[in-house]
């Protein structure tokens, strides 16, 4: 009996394995025979499997395919580690892509593919969550001027600890990513929860561990696990996320409870922070219902913690680009002088970050060269009858679409010498005042996709741009940093582009 059961288990397991390994070929067969493929058309099940497995090694298929097809206004398909192919549209079809309604091409369904929450937390209501994200980040953007004093206070505190306090003028070697991690997390937690929690080492530890574990599991399940295995692997991968959710609920529950009481009684003015905005929104949506604190905390952790790592990576790329640029061009000094003037002439009626066009252009250039994903504008075909593209190509329901962002950003038809780092590329001159001006960092277009484009552009991009300008400007004004000999090459994991995490820099406090 035991032997028979074992044999049945082996047969079922073998059948499942064969099915999983055949999935790349099934994906190929779903698409029209006229579809172009990069780097080659799968010639059979083993060929499709090999092309999919190749993507695990950080292949730049989307960028190379862009050069071969998209520059000729042709779409193409590539295999993925998830064993489900993706169709990449040329830039000429971006306006059409953005014009399609949600019930035809779904951004939300594609978003589920990217963050894998339906697999990691099946009971999580993603649609209510997305509405909350938009509302909360609107509050965050609107309150940028009101939070600048707290921002600068925490910026001074964290940089003193990490890079050196006034009077400490000795050169020191620090890990760039670790330093930015401490500075940026400190600032964000100060704005989200206030000074007491932002400097509570145990709380900060749990926040960082939760962020890293959740981000890693999202990337792993969404981009590296074959799609038939996602439901099972996702549930297992979600266990550590639930554990840290419980730890964070224990820490944050008293703060949320106190804030609910404050807003309901209206006896005191609550702090202008993320907790207040979130509780206020929850109460305004359902004035007569009880606010479920644990649910709010779970949503908050996803809204504000995970994007902090994105901000760290963008700032990391900025410094890697700047420090590896030609010292003779004196980009560092030009940005320092601009930042010194902005901080010295601070006008409390508007953010400091509004008076730094050179910084604006330099950040935008780093985002152009190093977006954090090689594909943007993801959509999933959800219309039952499929969809016909502007060039007449038909795609069945379930097809995953995107645009090769790195290819768009490095297209010589749009950008002169696109592979060259030109930090002041986006500068121009005001025709009336003759002063320098720059395209704002958060402004998206069909040629600049670092934050996406259209109505689903990253809702936190205005705060991210403001934060980067203040943090970078303050560091440039107060610290000397030795140049890097060459720019460390970013890594590619699935569709995600990650800066090198082990780069050491030499830094000292200025007199």
UniProtKB/Swiss-Prot annotation:
Its cofactor is heme. It comes from the Eukaryota. Pfam families: p450 (PF00067). It is found in: Membrane. It is a single-pass membrane protein. Its EC number is 1.-.-.-. Keywords: Glycoprotein, Heme, Iron, Membrane, Metal-binding, Monooxygenase, Oxidoreductase, Transmembrane, Transmembrane helix. Induction: Expression is regulated by a complex signaling network which may include cross-pathway interactions mediated by sensing of the cluster final products or shared biosynthetic intermediates. It is an enzyme of class 1 (oxidoreductase). Pathway: Secondary metabolite biosynthesis. One of its GO terms (cellular component) is membrane. PANTHER family: CYTOCHROME P450 (PTHR46206), P450, PUTATIVE (EUROFUNG)-RELATED (PTHR46206:SF1). Cytochrome P450 monooxygenase; part of the lna gene cluster that mediates the biosynthesis of diastereomeric piperazines. Lna and lnb clusters encode sets of enzymes that produce overlapping sets of previously undescribed metabolites such as piperazinomycin-like metabolites or morpholine. The lna and lnb biosynthetic pathways appear to be part of a signaling network that controls the formation of sclerotia, a resilient overwintering structure. One primary function of the non-canonical nonribosomal peptide synthetases lnaA and lnbA consists in the reduction of L-tyrosine. This is Cytochrome P450 monooxygenase lnaD. It comes from Aspergillus flavus (strain ATCC 200026 / FGSC A1120 / IAM 13836 / NRRL 3357 / JCM 12722 / SRRC 167). The lineage of its organism: Eukaryota, Fungi, Dikarya, Ascomycota, Pezizomycotina.
């Amino acid at each position: 009996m035991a032997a028979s059961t074992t044999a049945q288990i082996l047969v079922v397991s073998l059948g499942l394995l064969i099915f999983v390994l055949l999935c790349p070929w099934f994906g190929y067969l779903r698409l029209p025979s006229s579809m172009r493929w990069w780097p080659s058309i799968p010639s059979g099940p083993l060929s499709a499997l090999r092309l999919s497995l190749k993507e695990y090694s950080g292949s730049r298929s989307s960028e190379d395919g862009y050069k071969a097809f998209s520059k000729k206004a042709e779409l193409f398909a590539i295999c993925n580690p998830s064993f489900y192919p993706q169709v990449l549209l040329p830039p000429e079809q971006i306006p059409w892509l953005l014009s399609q309604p949600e019930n035809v091409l779904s951004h939300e369904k594609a978003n589920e593919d990217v963050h894998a929450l339906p697999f990691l937390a099946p009971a999580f209501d993603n649609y209510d969550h997305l509405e909350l994200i938009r509302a909360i980040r609107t509050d965050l953007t609107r309150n940028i001027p009101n939070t600048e004093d707290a921002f600068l206070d925490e910026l001074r505190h964290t940089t003193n600890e990490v890079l050196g306090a006034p009077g400490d003028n000795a050169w020191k070697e620090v890990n760039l990513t670790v330093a930015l991690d401490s500075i940026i997390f400190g600032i964000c937690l100060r704005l989200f929860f206030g000074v007491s929690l932002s400097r509570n080492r145990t709380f900060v530890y749990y926040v960082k561990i939760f962020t890293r574990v959740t981000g890693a599991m999202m990337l792993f399940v969404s981009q590296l696990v074959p799609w038939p295995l996602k439901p099972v692997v996702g549930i297992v991968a979600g266990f550590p996320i639930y554990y840290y959710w419980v730890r964070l609920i224990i820490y944050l529950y008293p703060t949320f409870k106190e804030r609910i009481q404050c807003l309901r009684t209206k006896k005191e003015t609550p702090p202008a922070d993320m907790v207040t905005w979130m509780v206020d929104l929850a109460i305004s949506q359902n004035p007569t219902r009880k606010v479920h604190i644990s649910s709010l905390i779970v949503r908050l952790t996803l809204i504000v913690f995970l994007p902090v790592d994105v901000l760290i990576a963008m700032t990391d790329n900025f410094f890697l680009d700047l420090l590896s640029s030609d010292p003779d061009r004196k980009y560092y000094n030009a940005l320092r002088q601009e930042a010194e003037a902005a901080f010295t002439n601070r006008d409390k009626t508007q953010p400091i970050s509004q008076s730094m066009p050179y910084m604006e252009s330099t950040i935008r250039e780093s985002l152009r060269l190093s977006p954090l994903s090689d594909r943007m504008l993801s959509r999933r075909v959800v219309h039952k009858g499929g969809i016909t593209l502007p060039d007449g190509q038909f795609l069945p329901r379930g097809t995953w679409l995107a645009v090769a962002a790195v290819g768009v950003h490095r297209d010589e038809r749009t950008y002169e010498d696109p592979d060259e780092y030109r930090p002041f590329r986006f500068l121009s001159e005001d025709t009336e005042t003759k002063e320098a001006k720059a395209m704002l960092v958060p402004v998206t277009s069909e040629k600049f996709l670092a934050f996406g484009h259209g109505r689903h552009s990253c809702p936190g991009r205005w705060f991210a741009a403001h934060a980067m300008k203040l943090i970078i400007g303050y560091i440039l004004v107060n610290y000397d940093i030795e140049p890097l000999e060459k720019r460390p090459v970013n890594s590619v994991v699935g569709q995600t582009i990650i800066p090198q995490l082990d780069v050491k820099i030499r830094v000292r406090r200025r007199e």
